[in-house]
């Protein structure tokens, strides 16, 4: 897709979004739900970024990392993610043995500069919505709840992913990329708060952050929001959509517990399997807000 067509699609999406925001009256005490992208709304298992991290290390430095190592810092901005992978004891030891020095910023820049073009090409292959995600989002919109979003992807990747997701029916009211703001991304609250500003939200306590990574949940806490962690559709379980649908109860229980042990470290208000389970949480938070409770 060339840049002119891409820009036209993004402009059309933004025009539609602004009209929707202005014409919708909220029937809920919840003002906005802010979603992560990969592993939350699209890309079941969050495979697009992780597989490209593995490929980027291999291509740039002939250095092997495992998919599991690539998953550990998920949720951070991608430059920070590469840095965090390099600091993993297992990776740092192998890097020192192979190159005789620790990974430095120049190395991270090289890997990042390899990662971005690869990710732009392949992100559209992972733009399929997670089961029932579009229905859940559209039902929230019908209630007058605004849909925000933010991602660990930089804007260059989001400019490819946004129109691909739109073709599949996902049209958030706001999209913030990890390099849109000068102060950096997660776990700081800047991207979530940028959504608050752009959406015209009156109180962060009336917002919910939904994410499949601990930095994303910490982002929500730091922004003063309710937080909902996803266990089975995201990075920590690492299942494909097909594996999830075909898995036995035992397999799902094992994957759920594995993810729960990681995600509970960020103290989410709620832990659910996938976005399909979100409506019940929405109702509970609505009742808590009506009673005067806050995150």
From Swiss-Prot:
Active site: 36, 78
Cofactor: Mg(2+)
Note on how the cofactor is bound: Binds 1 Mg(2+) ion per subunit.
Superkingdom per UniProt: Bacteria
GO BP: any one term: organic phosphonate catabolic process
Protein biosynthesis listed as a keyword: no
EC number, UniProt record: 3.11.1.1
Catalytic activity line of the entry: phosphonoacetaldehyde + H2O = acetaldehyde + phosphate + H(+)
Binding site for Mg(2+): 36, 38, 212
GO cellular component: cytosol
Molecular function in Gene Ontology: magnesium ion binding; phosphoglycolate phosphatase activity; phosphonoacetaldehyde hydrolase activity
Keywords of this entry: Hydrolase, Magnesium, Metal-binding, Schiff base
Keyword Metal-binding: yes
Family according to the record: Belongs to the HAD-like hydrolase superfamily. PhnX family.
UniProt function note: Involved in phosphonate degradation.
Subunit: Homodimer.
PANTHER family for the chain: PHOSPHOGLYCOLATE PHOSPHATASE, PHOSPHONOACETALDEHYDE HYDROLASE
Protein name: Phosphonoacetaldehyde hydrolase
């Amino acid at each position: 897709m060339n840049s002119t067509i891409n820009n036209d699609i993004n402009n059309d999406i933004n025009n539609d979004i602004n009209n929707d925001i202005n014409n919708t009256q909220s029937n809920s005490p919840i003002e906005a739900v802010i979603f992560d992208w990969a592993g939350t709304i699209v890309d079941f298992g969050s495979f697009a970024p992780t597989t490209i991290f593995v490929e980027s290390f291999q291509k740039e430095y002939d250095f092997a990392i495992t998919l599991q190592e690539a998953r550990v810092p998920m949720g951070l901005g991608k430059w920070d993610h590469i840095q965090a992978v390099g600091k993993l004891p297992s990776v740092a030891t192998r890097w020192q043995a192979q190159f005789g020095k620790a990974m430095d910023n120049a190395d991270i820049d090289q890997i990042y500069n390899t990662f971005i073009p690869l990710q732009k090409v392949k992100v559209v292959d992972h733009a399929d919505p997670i089961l029932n995600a579009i229905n859940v989002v559209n039902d929230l919109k019908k209630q007058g709840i605004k849909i925000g979003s933010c991602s660990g992807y930089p804007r260059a990747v989001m400019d490819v992913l946004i129109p691909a997701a739109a073709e599949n029916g996902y049209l958030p009211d706001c999209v913030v990329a990890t390099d849109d703001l000068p102060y950096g991304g997660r776990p700081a609250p800047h991207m979530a708060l940028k959504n608050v500003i752009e959406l015209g939200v009156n109180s962060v306590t009336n917002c919910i952050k939904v994410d499949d990574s601990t930095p994303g949940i910490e982002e929500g806490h730091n922004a003063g929001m309710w937080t909902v962690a996803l266990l089975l559709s995201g990075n920590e379980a690492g299942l494909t959509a097909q594996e999830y649908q075909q898995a036995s109860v035992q397999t799902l229980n094992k994957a759920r517990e594995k993810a729960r042990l990681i995600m509970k470290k960020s103290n989410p208000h709620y832990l659910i399997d996938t976005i399909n389970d979100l409506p019940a949480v929405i109702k509970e938070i609505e009742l808590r807000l009506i009673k005067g409770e806050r995150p």
